[in-house]
Amino acid sequence: MKKFFIIGTDTEVGKTYISTKLIEVCEHQNIKSLCLKPVASGQSQFSELCEDVESILNAYKHKFTAAEINLISFNQAVAPHIIAAKTKVDISIGNLKQFIENKYNQDLDILFIEGAGGLLTPYSDHTTQLDLIKALEIPVILVSAIKVGCINHTLLTINELGRHNIKLAGWIANCNDSNIKYTDEQISTIEELSGYKCSTKISQNADYLDFIDLSKILISPEENE
């Protein structure tokens, strides 16, 4: 089973959009996948579920339940550690790690774990999402929304991953805003300064076919278990 932790350079950069497209391409290619959203916030306007959890379940056509993919959820779209403190919920690295590792014995080809926001999103006053990724020891897929500021945010995230010896499996350029100019130039700059070639560039009207090449990279036998 391949395992990947999906993070963004920031919040609202399209992580869940990318996750659902990866799910779609796996489903079309009969690749057995499961995408977890261990920590979620922000209730959907259509149900009692958090919006990101609902989107993932919809991508799977509800063959999984919310409890199978999500451990902790908050109705308010607020930073997890803040709303956790307000509601007296403990976002424990140990509990999250156990929730994720309990899926390792399932018959899956690939396991995605979609994070909450960026790499250093706090879970508490003394822990961040980085601590969970380090505990899991699995590669990261980084999503960057190409816009003003993305070069700095992407390079900072890649540098921090490298500083902690976390493998970057690939990074995705989410070009979902047609008003942004010089997207190719921004992507090239990130590639040149980071040393990591963009795994795939996703346009506003992308479909699952745009993720075929990326899925082949992720499922390749060269990728570490």
Curated annotation (Swiss-Prot):
One of its GO terms (biological process) is biotin biosynthetic process. Pathway: Cofactor biosynthesis; biotin biosynthesis; biotin from 7,8-diaminononanoate: step 1/2. Substrate binds at residue 41. Its cofactor is Mg(2+). One of its GO terms (molecular function) is magnesium ion binding. It catalyses: (7R,8S)-7,8-diammoniononanoate + CO2 + ATP = (4R,5S)-dethiobiotin + ADP + phosphate + 3 H(+). ATP binds at residues 12-17, 52, 114-117, 174-175. The active site is at residue 37. It comes from the Bacteria. InterPro entries: DTB_synth_BioD (IPR004472), P-loop_NTPase (IPR027417). Its EC number is 6.3.3.3. It is found in: Cytoplasm. NCBIfam families: bioD. This is ATP-dependent dethiobiotin synthetase BioD. It comes from Francisella tularensis subsp. novicida (strain U112). The gene is bioD.
